[in-house]
């Protein structure tokens, strides 16, 4: 349902806002609506990718070795899947994500 909502936002809602803004002479506003629509499209893509991972049971298990990081305490595990429980802080598997250096 979330992906469908994002689809509606970028294909219909913000495009209609942009058209109305253009018709009323607000070209800069129309451009901003289209920029927001592009963001909403990316949101849809992310939701659909997550859904594929959930359906394939690949959220916490990967075919390749990954570095998993506990979002609570920062504990690192290297392997194909996240542990059931963090050995450091005892938080459940749901707290683990594939580590990404984004700095």
Specify the residue positions occupied by each region the protein language model found.
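Non-heme di-metal
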Residues: 1-103
């Amino acid at each position: 349902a979330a992906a469908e909502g994002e689809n509606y936002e970028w294909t219909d809602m913000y495009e209609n806002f942009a058209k109305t803004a253009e018709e009323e002479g607000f070209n800069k506003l129309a451009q901003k609506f289209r920029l927001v629509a592009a963001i909403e499209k990316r949101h849809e893509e992310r939701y659909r990718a997550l859904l594929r991972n959930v359906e394939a049971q690949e959220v916490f298990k990967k075919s390749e070795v990954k570095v998993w990081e506990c979002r609570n305490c920062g504990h690192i595990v290297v392997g194909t899947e996240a542990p059931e429980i963090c050995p450091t802080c005892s938080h459940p598997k749901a707290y683990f994500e594939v580590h990404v250096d984004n700095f």
